[in-house]
Curated annotation (Swiss-Prot):
One of its GO terms (biological process) is translation. This is Small ribosomal subunit protein uS19. Disulfide bonds: none annotated. Protein S19 forms a complex with S13 that binds strongly to the 16S ribosomal RNA. SUPFAM superfamilies: Ribosomal protein S19. InterPro entries: Ribosomal_uS19 (IPR002222), Ribosomal_uS19_bac-type (IPR005732), Ribosomal_uS19_CS (IPR020934), Ribosomal_uS19_SF (IPR023575). Keywords: Ribonucleoprotein, Ribosomal protein, RNA-binding, rRNA-binding. The keyword DNA repair does not apply. GO terms for cellular component: cytoplasm; small ribosomal subunit. PROSITE patterns: RIBOSOMAL_S19. One of its GO terms (molecular function) is structural constituent of ribosome. Belongs to the universal ribosomal protein uS19 family. The keyword S-adenosyl-L-methionine does not apply.
């Protein structure tokens, strides 16, 4: 279910503070580490790189215009697929 329009998009305060600090300093190369997968990507995030935690390590996510409105967690998968098991009877 989508978030109510009257509430508006959500972003953690600590993440927004880190973004504002990075934009003010002009440091677009640094990776902003975050555990906040639930935060919505805002237009002022464009051009920044986030290290989004997937439960094991931080995955670098470079934000582009097409990502605005999505959540950070959508771009850092948490599960790895290794394929189905091989049938040992067929040899």
């Amino acid at each position: 279910m989508a978030r109510s329009l009257k509430k508006g998009p959500f972003c953690d305060h600590h993440l927004m503070a880190k973004v504002e600090e990075a934009v003010a300093s002009g440091n677009n190369k640094a990776v902003i580490k975050t555990w906040s997968r639930r935060s919505t990507i805002f237009p002022n995030f464009i051009g920044l790189t986030f290290g989004v935690y997937n439960g094991k390590k931080h995955i670098p996510v470079h934000v582009t215009e097409q990502m605005v409105g999505h959540k950070l967690g959508e771009f850092a998968p948490t599960r790895t697929y290794h394929g189905h098991g091989v049938d040992k009877k067929k040899k």
